[in-house]
Regions:
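ABC ATP-binding cassette signature C-motif
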Residues: 1-272, 325-326, 330-586
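Short N-terminal helix-initiation segments at or just after the protein's N-terminus
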Residues: 9, 254, 286-292
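Hydrophobic stripe of amphipathic alpha-helices that form coiled-coil interfaces
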Residues: 104, 111, 137, 144, ...
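Intracellular alpha-helical coupling/juxtamembrane segments of multi-pass membrane proteins
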Residues: 260-288, 297-300, 304-314, 318
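Short acidic/polar alpha-helix capping motifs at helix-coil junctions
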Residues: 291-294, 468
Length: 586
C-alpha cells in the first residue's frame, strides 16, 4: 500500500535548481536509504516529505490519515523543557484530549449542571466519548510508553526531569528518536540519526529501525547502518539538465554499490555501441548528400533524410560518469620512522572521581593501524590528546614518572585531525590555512583546495563560514601537507560524504606510516584498522583484528560473564598475545 506519493516536484534555492520533475512512491513498510553526495538535496527532499518545506512545483500526497515523524540532523528540542515532557509533547492530540476530559469533569461539579439532569447527561456522554477516544489513541499507556522508550534509549531516570539543554548531542538525538516513535508514525524520516551516537547506541538504532512496522527513509553516511537496516536504496545523483534525479536500487548499500558499478559498465557499453551506430549513420548521410549534390538525385536526398530521422528517433544514451569527481588525497610521510612508534607505559588519567585510564599499557609498532573505540565519554579522545601531548598523564603514571609514561619514537612525526576542527583558525581563509603548513604561492594553494572540492569563492572566505564537510576537507588537505608518518585521527569521517570517506580509506590503505584513529564508523574501521583498543571503565583492552572481529569477541564475552582483564602481551615473556587482553601492568 502506498504511504507517500511524490508527483513531479521541483525545488530551487538561490537560483540553483536542486531537483525538477522528481517522482517517487514510498510503500508501507519499506526501509529506504537515501544516498547521494553532500549538497545534492537529500535533506531538502526529506523536509519536503515531512511537510516542513513546500515544493516549487508538483505535490507530495500522503495516504489519508497517515502520520509522519521527522528527526533532523541536529535535534535540540525545547532547551528548558524537561526530557519526559519533550517526549509527551509528541502527542499534542492526547494532551488536548486530556484537557477536554479535565474540562468535562470540572463541568460535572458545577451546581448548575448538577441540578439539571439533561445537562448532566450531556456532560457525562461527552466525558465518556472523550475517554473512549483517549483510550483508542493509546492515551492511558502514554506515560508508560514514554518512560519505557527513555529506558530503551539508555537515559537514566534521574535525567527525565532535567532540561533538554543539559544533555549531550547524542542524548538529545536519542530523545528526538524516542519522541518520533511515541508519535506512532506510519512514515519515519531520519536525517543522519547516527550522528553523535557511540557503537552501543548505533546497534540500538539498528534494532529500532528493523523492528519498526511502518516505512522508514534514512539519510546516513554510515554504510554499516545502511547494510544492516534497509532493503532499498534511493540515490539522488546529478543530472545534466534537471538539477538531480532519483534512482532506485533493490537491496542494501553493499548490493547498491555492486549494482551501480555493473549498471554504469553496461551503460558505457551501450553508449559506445550507440555512438558507433550514430557515426555510421552520419557517414552514410554525408555520402548520400555528396552523391545528391553531384548527380542531383532525389532518391539520395530521401535516403539522407531517412538516416537523419533514424538518429532523431533514437533514445539517446547519456555518456555515463564512471567516476564522479572526488577529493585527491594521498599521504606521503617525509621519513620512515623507527620500528616502535608509541609506547604507553602505565598511563593514569582521571578527572575528579571519574577515572578514565588506570595503568594503561600498550605498544604501537610503526606501520600499525589502531582503532580506538568505547562509549561516549569513556576517554577515547582523551587518550588521543595525551599521545599528542595536549593533555598530560596524571602524576601517578608510570610509577610517578608521568613525563615518561607516553613514549613517542624520536623519528615519529605526529599529524592530528581534530573532531571539532580545532586545528583550524576559523578567522583565516582556507588559502591561509594551507600556506601556514607549507610555504606556497596563492595559486598553488587554490589549486590544491580545488582538488579537495573547495571552490575558489569558498577558498577566499573565513573558514568559519564553510560547511562541516568543507572544514573537514580543508583539515585533510593540511594534514596531507604535513608529511607526518603517524596520523592521529579523531572521528575523521564525520561530515564526510560516503565518496570522500572511501577516498580517505584508500589513502590510509596506501599510507606507509602509522594510523591511530578514534571512530564510531564501523565500516571505516573494518576497512582501515588491524587492532582495536577499547577504553572501558578505566581499563584499556587490546583486540587483535578489525572491528568485526572485536565486535564478535565482545559479544562472546558478554554472553556468559565479563572476563577478568588479562596482563598485557609484553608482561609475559615468550607468550603470544591473546586475541583479547587488558593492557594492565604488573
Amino acid at each position: 500500500m502506498i504511504i507517500a506519493d511524490i508527483n513531479s516536484i521541483a525545488r530551487a534555492h538561490g537560483g540553483r535548481t536542486i531537483f525538477s520533475d522528481l517522482s517517487w512512491t514510498i510503500q508501507d513498510g519499506e526501509k529506504i536509504g537515501l544516498v547521494g553526495p553532500n549538497g545534492i538535496g537529500k535533506s531538502t527532499l526529506l523536509r519536503t516529505l515531512a511537510g516542513l518545506e513546500s515544493p516549487d512545483a508538483g505535490a507530495v500526497v500522503l495516504r489519508r490519515g497517515a502520520r509522519v515523524a521527522y528527526l533532523p540532523q541536529e535535534y535540540a528540542g525545547e532547551p528548558r523543557r524537561a526530557v519526559l515532557d519533550e517526549l509527551l509533547a509528541a502527542r499534542d492530540d492526547l494532551h488536548t484530549l486530556e484537557q477536554r476530559i479535565a474540562a468535562a469533569e470540572a463541568r460535572m461539579g458545577e451546581p448548575a449542571v448538577a441540578a439539571d439532569m439533561a445537562a448532566l447527561e450531556r456532560v457525562l456522554a461527552e466525558h465518556e466519548r472523550l475517554l473512549e477516544q483517549f483510550a483508542a489513541l493509546g492515551g492511558p499507556a502514554l506515560h508508560g510508553r514514554a518512560e519505557s522508550l527513555l529506558r530503551d534509549m539508555g537515559l537514566p531516570e534521574e535525567q527525565w526531569q532535567q532540561p533538554m539543554e543539559v544533555l549531550s548531542g547524542g542524548q538529545r538525538k536519542l530523545v528526538g528518536l524516542a519522541r518520533c516513535l511515541l508519535a506512532d508514525p506510519d512514515l519515519l524520516l531520519l536525517d543522519e540519526p547516527d550522528n553523535h551516537l557511540d557503537m552501543e547506541r548505533k546497534t540500538l538504532l539498528e534494532q529500532i529501525i528493523r523492528a519498526f512496522d511502518g516505512a522508514v527513509v534514512i539519510i546516513s553516511h554510515d554504510r554499516y547502518l545502511l547494510d544492516e537496516t534497509v532493503g532499498l536504496i534511493a540515490e539522488i545523483e546529478p543530472a545534466r539538465e534537471q538539477g538531480a534525479r532519483l534512482l532506485l536500487w533493490e537491496g542494501n548499500y553493499s548490493a547498491y554499490v555492486t549494482q551501480k558499478e555493473l549498471a554504469l559498465l553496461k551503460q558505457q557499453q551501450d553508449y559506445i555501441a550507440q555512438q558507433k551506430e550514430i557515426s555510421q549513420l552520419e557517414a552514410a548521410i554525408a555520402r548520400f548528400k555528396l552523391w545528391a549534390s553531384i548527380v542531383v538525385n532525389e532518391r539520395h536526398i530521401k535516403q539522407a533524410r531517412n538516416k537523419q530521422r533514424q538518429i532523431d528517433r533514437m533514445d539517446k544514451i547519456e555518456r555515463p560518469v564512471l567516476e564522479r569527481r572526488r577529493i585527491a588525497l594521498q599521504f606521503h610521510p617525509q621519513q620512515r620512522g623507527g620500528a616502535k612508534a608509541i609506547d604507553l607505559r602505565g598511563v593514569d588519567k582521571a578527572f575528579g572521581d571519574n577515572i578514565i585510564l588506570l595503568d594503561a599499557r600498550a605498544t604501537i609498532m610503526n606501520g600499525e593501524r589502531v582503532g580506538i573505540v568505547g562509549a561516549n565519554g569513556a576517554g577515547k579522545s582523551v587518550l588521543l590528546r595525551m599521545i599528542l601531548g595536549q593533555l598530560a598523564p596524571d602524576p601517578s603514571s608510570y610509577r610517578g614518572r608521568a613525563e615518561d609514561a607516553i613514549w613517542i619514537g624520536p623519528s615519529i612525526q605526529l599529524g592530528f585531525y581534530a573532531q571539532q576542527h580545532e586545528t583550524l583558525d576559523m578567522r583565516k581563509t582556507p588559502i591561509e590555512a594551507l600556506r601556514d603548513v607549507r610555504p606556497m604561492y596563492e595559486g598553488e594553494a587554490v589549486a590544491k583546495l580545488g582538488r579537495f572540492l573547495i571552490p575558489y569563492a569558498a577558498a577566499q572566505q573565513p573558514i568559519a563560514r564553510l560547511s562541516g564537510g568543507e572544514k573537514s576537507r580543508v583539515q585533510l588537505a593540511r594534514l596531507m601537507l604535513t608529511g607526518a608518518n603517524c596520523l592521529l585521527l579523531d572521528e575523521p569521517t564525520n561530515n564526510l560524504d560516503i565518496a570522500s570517506a572511501e577516498v580517505l580509506e584508500g589513502a590510509l590503505d596506501e599510507f606507509a606510516g602509522t594510523v591511530v584513529v578514534v571512530s564510531h564508523d564501523r565500516y571505516f574501521l573494518d576497512r582501515v584498522v588491524d587492532r582495536i583498543f577499547e577504553v572501558r571503565d578505566g581499563e584499556l583492552y587490546v583486540y587483535e583484528g578489525g572491528y568485526s572481529y572485536y565486535a564478535e569477541q565482545r559479544a562472546r564475552q558478554l554472553r556468559p560473564a565479563e572476563p577478568t582483564p588479562a596482563r598485557p602481551p609484553g608482561d609475559v615473556k615468550g607468550k603470544k598475545p591473546a586475541p583479547t587482553t587488558r593492557t594492565n601492568g604488573q
